[in-house]
Amino acid sequence: MIIIFSPAKTLDFAPTHQTLLSSKPVFHKEADYLAALLFALTPDELGELMSISSKLTELNFERFQKWGMKETRKASKQAIFTYHGEAFEGLNAATFNDVELIFAQQHFRILSGLYGILGPLDLIRPHRLEMAVRLKNELGKDLYAFWKGKITKQLKKELKRDIAISEQPILINLASNEYFSSIDTKKLNARIITPVFKEYKDGGYIIVSIYAKRARGMMSRFIIQNGITDPDQLKLFDSEGYYYNDRLSEGDNWLFTRG
């Protein structure tokens, strides 16, 4: 069973001492290629491409200008401890022990516009590149053209080990639509379960983005800390008042509600 997750825009490269365990991104050469494309852009071109403020443009222009420098490589940090946002707050990886981190390394994947797909302990450098950015490259007009085949092939390879413990590989989709769209699901040949989190309001259930992001992190944490490989055990998730709503769930779109 593999969990897929979205990255965050905010990165924290302050040193941490959670673990000495680390790994190299499987698509590190592809990341270098994309970084070289971004290195060649002027600040104005970079800001327009990413639709970001002048302050963020300045920061990210400097990041890609320094991409290949020794000090940049030395400043690399494990992905799971670097990304910061609502989903990663729910995940709270800083409290994981080494056993939990090793389980995460086997079952948890972060999709990335720059790195394609990351294991939690993969070392990453300072960057910003969202999957929806229309960066022209050798394979097409945008990052979906560049990554879809590569990410799908890699996930398919990693999911094959599921066959030993279940009749069909299982993908738990806890990523946003922007990142989930980087996968060719028809070629994956896997059962895809998508947990959806809703709040009760005015007589019905609605998705509140900030809460849904946090809940995706909490669900991932629940899977990792309990070493879950049987998807039916996800229905036991009850963090912060959520519960599995069988009545409103449809197929493999599993609804968790609260309120």
Residues covered by each model-derived region:
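Active-site helix-to-loop segments that bind/position phosphate- or nucleotide-bearing substrates
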Residues: I4-T95
